[in-house]
Amino acid sequence: MTAFRFAALAFAAAALAAPAIAPAKVTPPRVSAASFTSLASPLPLPYDEKANADAQVAAARNRALKTHKRLLIDLGGNWCLDCRLLAGTIDLPEMKRFVDAHFVVVTVDIGRFDKNGQIAARYGIKGRLKGVPAVLVVDPRSNKLLNAGHETELADARSMGPQALADWLARWAA
């Protein structure tokens, strides 16, 4: 086989494999809140500090398998403004409908980066998280992290706005 043919076959194989790992093409909802100041106040406190995170993630994965949705693991803490802004955005009616249609969501309290690190480690994230919220989008069938390298992109949510959060989530919906 010539080098050119080998290169052409390798390129074709890569092109066929790319859609399997590329973000999805789902239209995001139009969010009614123009800014975070439009969200309900006080912002939600979504993380249960006493919950058994391993059991919660396992139960959520089972629900995702049964409903053919992606698993969305939201790692954060109630002390984190960006985490609470994400939760407040997800609580908007149009976002709630969108998220419920595409994901099974589980929130996991990470304390002050000193709890439930095994959840992130299970999906290949080594060491301490770079920021929160860390959002892991998982294929429940393979238990594979679909947004590897992008899990902490919402850690500065306050600089994004509600529509940008909706757009980000839509990238990973199926």
Regions found by a protein language model. Give the residues of each.
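N-terminal leader/targeting and pre-domain segments
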Residues: 25-67
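Conserved redox-active cysteine motifs that mediate thiol-disulfide chemistry
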Residues: 77-90
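Structural alpha/beta surface segment adjacent to cysteine/selenocysteine redox centers
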Residues: 111-131, 141
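Non-catalytic, surface beta->alpha helical segment in thiol-disulfide oxidoreductase systems
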Residues: 129-174
